[in-house]
């Protein structure tokens, strides 16, 4: 039995669900509906709510929405649509006038007649600016002979003329002025602003015409706009959810709002889609200015950024009216008066002010650097000369005052007189030799005086000899009286005459006294030293000395000779010619009287000694 059961199991048959349900329902011969295959494109069209591009057949009416009239779609060509015009606004009698807005500024009457070719046009009016007759206001009027021509002209709304999309509307005689001031005032002002830059350029809003419209945004925007609009709050919900075409004849000049937005896709579709929030909540403050008279909402928002877009409707219209009366702002004309001769003072003042204004340095003058450098150099040179004179004056002042050389001869004569008085008792020969020695000494002193005077005359600017010369000691026998006591009693005389002291032999023996010469004046010459040494040698023969005097005398001679050579070497460059060889004339005249006085004094002393 089990084997038979296995044999009875067979593979089942696949049937559709509708057939299975029909068999289970017991209806027997029920009709079965098999859906036709639908492409994914058709399904998305149904979900989006858009209409397919194919016409529906009667078989599809069960599954699809009823067909929609293509002529009301905004994407349909304008030639396929009838002009959506309120016939109640059309004039019943001529003239049949159409308003033309957004005209190019280079438009002419012939170009407008060519634009409306085929129509019975009778006249064209193009208003011009009162301040500038060559400039158009941007709008005009066209009169037609019959009503059919006017209807045909209204169907040409938003057509291009000279790279501009012009507006064609019915011109009501009672509303011409108000329409000019309020409805198209913004367009004229906007176009006049564009003339300042590139008014021939294509409007920037044309690029938004290619965007497809969206369904649902229109009712949403109308609902909130009407809700916040205080003037039309009563009709808010009714107008916001109205499905059919909406006409506000009294307020918007008979223009169909849906037609206006439908013909301009950017206003209804693109702009409301991207800015619905601003449109819903901000339109209450804008007082419905965006849609008045077919105004371009997008251009009004972005082309005209001024405070009037937020003002009330009445204020805005009055402002436009005043601005139209005034005309565009222009530069005031120059009122040139006849030229009059300006005053000299005013002219000089103006020239001075203009010169100061033109000079970036003001009243400053350029500095003559060469002259300034010369002045500085002269001032520095004067200062150096003054400083040099100040340095030279102290040197001249420091020069010791030269005393007349007669004081040396007198002092020497007194000393010799005392010495000869003491020596005359010894021998007459010694007195004679002393007298000759004194005569030679006086002659040499006069000669030294003459030489000193001539040297001063020939070399007034010669440097004085250095004061720090080595001290010299002169060998001399002890005098009659103590030389140290005499020096202490009369230091100036001794200091000045120490270099002319002569050795005098005394009975005390041969002692040598070291005599320190004082500071020598500038007139002191080396010839005096040699003469003194010669005089000492002359007296050495007649004076009795000790056994050691000869050696010490030779030693001091050598020292004096070396010192004289050093002084000669330390002298400055060879001075001008010095008449050392021929002072005979001056010496004879000066020494003649000196010799007589010395001889007379010697004779008197000799007489005293003999007595």
Swiss-Prot record:
**What sections of the protein cross the membrane?**
none
Function field = Required for the binding of mRNA to ribosomes. Functions in close association with EIF4-F and EIF4-A. Binds near the 5'-terminal cap of mRNA in presence of EIF-4F and ATP. Promotes the ATPase activity and the ATP-dependent RNA unwinding activity of both EIF4-A and EIF4-F.
Q: Where is this cross-link: Glycyl lysine isopeptide (Lys-Gly) (interchain with G-Cter in SUMO2)?
A: 343
Gene3D superfamilies per the UniProt record, alphabetical: 3.30.70.330
User: How is the protein modified post-translationally, according to the record?
Assistant: Phosphorylated at Ser-422 by RPS6KA1 and RPS6KB1; phosphorylation enhances the affinity of EIF4B for the EIF3 complex. In response to mTORC1 activation, RPS6KA1-mediated phosphorylation at 'Ser-406' and 'Ser-422' stimulates bicarbonate cotransporter SLC4A7 mRNA translation, increasing SLC4A7 protein abundance and function.
Q: Which gene encodes it?
A: Eif4b
| CDD domains cross-referenced by the UniProt entry | RRM_eIF4B
The cysteines joined by S-S bonds are none
> What protein am I looking at?
Eukaryotic translation initiation factor 4B
Which regions are flagged for Low complexity bias? Answer: 348-359, 584-597
Q: Which residue ranges have biased composition labelled Polar residues?
A: 487-506
The keyword Ligase is annotated on this UniProt entry: no
Q: Highest taxon of the source?
A: Eukaryota
Taxonomy of origin reads: Eukaryota, Metazoa, Chordata, Craniata, Vertebrata
| Organism listed in the record | Mus musculus
Q: Where is the composition biased (Basic and acidic residues)?
A: 79-89, 173-203, 211-271, 285-328, 370-420, 439-458, 551-583
Q: Basic residues bias located where? A: 1-13
PTM N6-acetyllysine: list the residues. Answer: 365, 586
Q: Which UniProt keywords apply?
A: Acetylation, Initiation factor, Isopeptide bond, Phosphoprotein, Protein biosynthesis, RNA-binding, Ubl conjugation
Locate the RRM domain: which residues? 96-173
**GO terms assigned for molecular function:** RNA binding; translation initiation factor activity
Quaternary state and interactors: Self-associates and interacts with EIF3 p170 subunit.
Keyword Secreted recorded: no
**Compositionally biased intervals (Acidic residues):** 599-611
Modification Phosphoserine, positions: 93, 192, 207, 219, 283, 359, 406, 409, 418, 422, 425, 445, 459, 462, 497-498, 504, 597
């Amino acid at each position: 039995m089990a084997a038979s059961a296995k044999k009875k199991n067979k593979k089942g048959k696949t049937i559709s669900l509708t057939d299975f349900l029909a068999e289970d329902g017991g209806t027997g011969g029920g009709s079965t509906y098999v859906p036709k295959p639908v492409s994914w494109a058709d399904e998305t069209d149904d979900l989006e709510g858009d209409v397919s591009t194919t016409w529906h057949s009667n078989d599809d009416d069960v599954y699809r929405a009823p067909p929609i009239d293509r002529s009301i779609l905004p994407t349909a060509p304008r030639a396929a649509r009838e002009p959506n015009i309120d016939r109640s606004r059309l004039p019943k009698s001529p003239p049949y006038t159409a308003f033309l807005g957004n005209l190019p500024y280079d438009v002419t009457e012939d170009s407008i007649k060519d634009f409306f070719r085929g129509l019975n046009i009778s006249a064209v009016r193009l208003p011009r600016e009162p301040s500038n007759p060559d400039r158009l206001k941007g709008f005009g009027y066209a009169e037609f002979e019959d009503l059919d021509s006017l209807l045909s002209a209204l169907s040409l709304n938003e057509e291009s003329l000279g790279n501009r999309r012009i507006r064609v509307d019915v011109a009501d005689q009672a509303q011409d002025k108000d329409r000019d001031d309020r409805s198209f005032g913004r367009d004229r002002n906007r176009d006049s602003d564009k003339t300042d830059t590139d008014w021939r350029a294509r409007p920037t809003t044309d690029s938004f015409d290619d965007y497809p419209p969206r369904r649902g945004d229109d009712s949403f925007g109308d609902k909130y706009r009407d809700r916040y609009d205080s003037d039309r709050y009563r009709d808010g919900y009714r107008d916001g959810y109205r499905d059919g075409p909406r006409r506000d004849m009294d307020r918007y000049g008979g223009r169909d709002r849906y037609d206006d937005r439908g013909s301009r896709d950017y206003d209804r579709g693109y702009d409301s889609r991207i800015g619905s929030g601003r449109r819903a909540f901000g339109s209450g403050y804008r007082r419905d200015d965006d849609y008045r008279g077919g105004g371009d909402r997008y251009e009004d928002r972005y082309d005209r950024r001024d405070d009037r877009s937020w003002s009330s409707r009445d204020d805005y219209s009055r402002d436009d009216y005043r601005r139209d009366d005034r005309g565009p702002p222009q530069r005031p004309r120059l009122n040139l008066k006849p030229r009059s001769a300006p005053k000299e003072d005013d002219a000089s003042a103006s020239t001075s002010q203009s010169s100061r204004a033109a000079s970036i340095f003001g009243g400053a003058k350029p500095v003559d650097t060469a002259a300034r450098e010369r002045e500085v150099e002269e001032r520095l040179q004067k200062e150096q000369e003054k400083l040099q004179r100040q340095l030279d004056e102290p040197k001249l002042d420091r020069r010791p005052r030269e005393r007349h050389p007669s004081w040396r001869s007198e002092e020497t004569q007194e000393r010799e007189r005392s010495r000869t008085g003491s020596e005359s008792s010894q021998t007459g020969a010694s007195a004679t030799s002393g007298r000759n020695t004194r005569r030679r000494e006086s002659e040499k002193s006069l000669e030294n005086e003459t030489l000193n005077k001539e040297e001063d005359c020939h070399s007034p600017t010669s440097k004085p000899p250095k004061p720090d010369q080595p001290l010299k000691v002169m060998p001399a026998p002890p005098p009659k009286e103590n030389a140290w006591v005499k020096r202490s009693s009369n230091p100036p005389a001794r200091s000045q005459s120490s270099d002319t002291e002569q050795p005098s032999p005394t009975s005390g023996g041969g002692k040598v006294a070291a005599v320190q010469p004082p500071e020598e004046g500038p007139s002191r010459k080396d010839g005096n030293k040699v003469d003194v040494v010669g005089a000492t040698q002359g007296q050495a023969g007649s004076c009795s000395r000790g056994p050691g005097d000869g050696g010490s005398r030779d030693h001091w001679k050598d020292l004096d000779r070396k010192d004289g050579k050093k002084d000669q070497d330390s002298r400055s460059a060879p001075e001008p010619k010095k008449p050392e060889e021929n002072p005979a004339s001056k010496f004879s005249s000066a020494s003649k009287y000196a010799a007589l006085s010395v001889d007379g004094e010697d004779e008197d002393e000799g007489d005293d000694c003999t007595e």
